Amino acid sequence: LKSLKDRIQGLEEKALPLQGQQFSIVNGQLTATPDNKKSYIDNGYSVNDIVYSIVNLILDKIRVAPWGLYKVVDESSLKSYNGLIRKKNLSGKEYKRALSLHQKALEPITNANSSTGKLMELLKWPNDEETYNDYVAAGCGYKLLTGDKYQWANLLDMGANKGIPQELWNLPSQVTKILALKGFPPRKVGYQFEGDGIYQYPKEEVSHELYWNPNWGINQQLNGMAPLKAALKTITRNNSAKDASSSKFQNNGLEAVIYVDEPGISDAQGKHQHAKATKQALISEYTGTKNQGKIAVSPYKMGVANLGLSPVELGIIEAEKWDAVLLCAIYGVPPELIGVVSKTYNNVVEAEKALTSRSALPLLTSHRDNYNRKLQTDWGFRGQNVYVDYDVSVYTELQEDVNQILDWTNKLIAVRPNEQRTLAGLEADPDPLMDQLWVTTAGRQPLEDYQIGAVDEALNPDNENVA
């Protein structure tokens, strides 16, 4: 009799070609990759220019943010900051408030020891191949395409920094599988990466980020759901439209047939000779840029039969535009940024804000939260006051428009000039008058001078000076 393991392996061999899935076995439990995640890269990002453009718009935003190591000095402000920064419609006023809370909650670590010094080094160069910004962007790219992001930490196994990462790598999520135990809830015990060989890592070494997955099967819910899975039909249609359009241009063949429909020419030989003469005349007299606009004349009745339809007539180009809009919606990217809808300065500015707040910041925040969780659990900094975060102040498109600020503050009856300068992002003026209320009459002046002037006017109705 076959052992239970042999029987399960036999089941795996039967299931793999039928399901298009990959399986691992841990204590008799099959763990399946829920769908062919490699296809989202092969048939999406690698060959579809719309998907490529959308994903890279997001990744370019992600690369902008610098990272730093902090210590928490105000837990309450940190919670408020995290709550604000998770909003996908962050207003300029809320953005300014978030910057203030971040400064109040976190203090940069400047005097590093051997442990925090290594962590600071990783925030510059996580491995031999990438900067930290590129490393974060690459991981987010996997998450956008496959729904999963795996960070492997090569932990030091001895010395003063034992348990601390010495390097960080992204595992390609399309070829990484989860190893799990049976039972409910399903428990992850490790991860398996299939490259030039099979590599297995305990769960303590890997940080796994994923999008929520409502699909339950053989532990399918342990994997994230790829956004492109919901757009699978749109991608398939768009790729087919591009193939049809390319085929039309590359294999154009005959566009039309010119025929003789003259009752006076009845014999086949005569029609053939006339067709031949017409062809020669068209080639010699009516082709080329210099002959554009010439009118051809024939003494015989002739006709034209069009063959096939153009991509415009087939509606391919219009369908591609709508596919682009739908794919933008999947990722929360404004379609103005890939040029499929009309653009003006104002809507491009608003689109850049939406790209940052709706697409880039959620990915950056997720990376930060998972990284800090691993530092406080498995990566050597349990119980220590260290906090990794990105600097959101570089996204200046989120701040309020200075012209709008000046416009509404100038309409106030009374305002302190330094308040106006601060709102506009300028440093306060040290002149004490700039901290006083100024009022708007015919012009602007300090409230104190305005009040003295009003008293003088009341005491001297004839505008006589008082000694």
Regions found by a protein language model. Name each.
Residues 139, 147, 269-290, 308-419, ...:
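C-terminal amphipathic alpha-helical
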Residues 1-312, 316, 322, 326, ...:
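Structured, contiguous alpha/beta core segments that scaffold functional sites
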